[in-house]
């Protein structure tokens, strides 16, 4: 990231193994008020989730090794209120209900919906901070 990040920036862990998609998405979502950490597989992402605090996990479903849904399930097991966006070209809606209410499925080609989801998460976090929820 070239810009200095806001200390209150939305902390996003983005997991994607396809370099072209990864680079395009990072370019679209990274900004001064968003800090994006990128991983290419679920195991590396899990290590990041253990070492740092993130507001949202954005992950592809089909990854080398463990799937993005397995990663999400593992992270949510520690706190079901965490936010997850499954950003994938695969149809995984059947698994969505089992992951919880804070998980959204967004098709990979829908960058506008990804942006809307990140804005909504930021607004929710700001509201919670003001109400101390």
Per-region residue spans from a language model:
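Acidic, metal-coordinating helix/loop segments flanking the phosphotransfer/catalytic sites
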Residues: 38-56, 116
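Short amphipathic alpha-helix used as the core "switch/output" element in two-component signaling
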Residues: 69-81
